[in-house]
Design a protein with these regions (language model features):
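Single conserved hydrophobic/aromatic residue that forms the stacking wall/gate
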Residues: 1-10
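A structural signal for well-ordered alpha-helical segments within the folded catalytic domains
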Residues: 4, 41, 45, 183-187, ...
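Conserved SAM-binding loop
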Residues: 14-22, 27-135, 242-247
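S-adenosyl-L-methionine-dependent methyltransferase catalytic module, highlighting the catalytic core
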Residues: 103-114, 121-249
Length: 252
């Protein structure tokens, strides 16, 4: 059974989503990049029908094991999103800590709307690229370099050189370089949403990511409204960006 500490990790996510959609057993939810299924379990506990996809077979196995141990049903599939097809249409799509890893973001946005039910919504969560650890450098094996803020903003050649100096593995360097290539900013996200017919129903920028509460015992804090309105500057202070979007053609 999931611990109360693990439950708290996702509390802010589900509380945020519940402001914009009524959740019931008839609500069908898809998570893209579901990992071990932690985001989906709170929705399953509310009786929703949940589906998760992930490219990593090991993560899908973890999700299936996790749900079985918790006593809830979930449908999980190992697949790349760009190869995913479904006869179902989803009232809610979850995209948490995924979009910043996608290289072809335009195609990603374009492929989403056919999966949305009429009046369906999408929840997005991602770290702004320029925030202190927007490059995910915390995955480094070297404890010193993993705690260096803003190192990912160095020019690519210098960034890779520094990582090699700290004896990071080639696979780690390649992963971090790929994240640098695929980076996502607040402004880029909002431009893509507009281009592909999505209206932004709500935006919440976090100065302290809600997930830091369980990881680092830091209380979640929203970004000050004045800072949230300052283009470019806000990217450096937003450790997590929550959005709710709707597709205009599905809400006419």
């Amino acid at each position: 059974v999931r611990s109360s500490a693990a439950s708290d990790v996702y509390k802010e996510d589900i509380d945020y989503v519940k402001q914009f959609i009524s959740l019931s057993p008839s609500t069908h939810i898809l998570e893209i990049g579901c990992g071990e299924g932690g985001n989906l379990l709170p929705f399953a506990e509310l009786g929703c029908k949940v589906t998760g996809i992930d490219r990593a077979a090991s993560r899908i196995h973890q999700a299936e094991t996790f749900f079985t141990a918790s006593g809830y049903k979930g449908e999980f599939t190992t697949t790349d999103f760009f190869n995913f097809s479904s006869a179902s249409r989803y009232q809610l799509i979850l995209i948490h800590d995924v979009i910043e890893h996608i290289s072809n973001k335009e195609e990603f946005f374009r492929c989403l709307s056919p999966l949305l039910a009429k009046r369906g919504i999408i929840f997005w969560g991602f770290p702004s690229w320029q925030m202190p650890f927007g490059g995910h450098q915390q995955i480094c094996h070297n404890r010193f370099v993993s705690s260096l803020p803003f190192i990912h903003l160095c020019p690519g050649i210098l960034y890779r050189f520094l990582l090699r100096c700290f004896h990071e593995t080639p696979s780690c360097i390649e992963e971090l370089s790929d994240i640098k290539r695929c980076r996502m900013t607040i402004d880029t996200f909002e431009q893509l949403a507009e281009k592909y017919g999505y209206e932004i129903t709500d935006r919440q920028l976090w100065f302290i990511n809600p997930h830091y509460q369980q990881k680092f015992h830091l209380r979640p804090r929203k970004l000050y409204p004045v800072l949230a309105q300052l283009k470019y500057i806000r990217n450096y202070f937003s450790t997590s960006c929550f959005y709710i979007t709707r597709h205009r053609e599905l809400h006419d």
